[in-house]
Amino acid sequence: TFANNAVEAITGSPGIGLTRIAFRQFHGRNTEIHVADFDGHNAKRLTLDNSIAAGPEWTPNNNTLYYYSYRRHNPDIYSHNLQTGARRTVARYSGSNISPAVSPDGRRLAMVLSKAGSPDIWVGSANGTGLRRLTTTKEAESSPCWSPDGRWICFASRASGSTRLYKIPANGGAMSRIRTIGVVNATEPDWSPDGRAIVFTTMRGGGVFEICIVPPGGGNVEVLATGEDPSWAPNSRTLMFTKRSRGKRVLSVLDVPTKRVKTLPRSFPGNCSQAAWTK
């Protein structure tokens, strides 16, 4: 398409003109999941929970979204087929059931469950069965994401006191820290589709959030922009993230090599955050 070709001509990377995003939008005290084209057009509200719905995550075929919702007064994980509208419960245990992350082959789901005590990383099949607990720390784990080869899960943990990045084999094993030199707290990791980098959020003094990037093996951190909630586009060059502008949360696009930031051509009413790009 023209849009895809134009993006590729400018960036040298495959276009994103046909991609879509899912995100949460604030409606008073509630948040609902919405979907739209990556530029903000053709927006559609997906959930009508009149509650808190958050953490959208696409399946690789882009026809189903996972998210969690408080619609039953407890954070539970759901899958939502965008073609049929069918919604099913994936994880509904006592405590928190949040942060679903789909494996690259679409067959497995990582999530944060607190049914055994503190919030830990668990992995199960895509429908939530066959659960296996990966982390057993006494501290809170959060924000799991998969390596593109499906072998590793990266996440944030307070196991060492401050929140830092770790990885663990998806089939079980020891967790190891990903060094983020120059940053003392790191959360919300997202592994690039080409496997070359992990972006994450850090909080500086004064409550300022920054988007940073680090090699998957750890190392020096580069600050990309002020913001939070980073999500890679399929081209491993472009990020969607949340920027605070004039007291409002807006979705913005970042070209990683040039660090150029643009707000979406079509903005949404109200605050928006937690954008997730199609695979």
Feature annotation, model-predicted:
Residues 1-279:
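Sequence signature of WD/YWTD-type beta-propeller architectures
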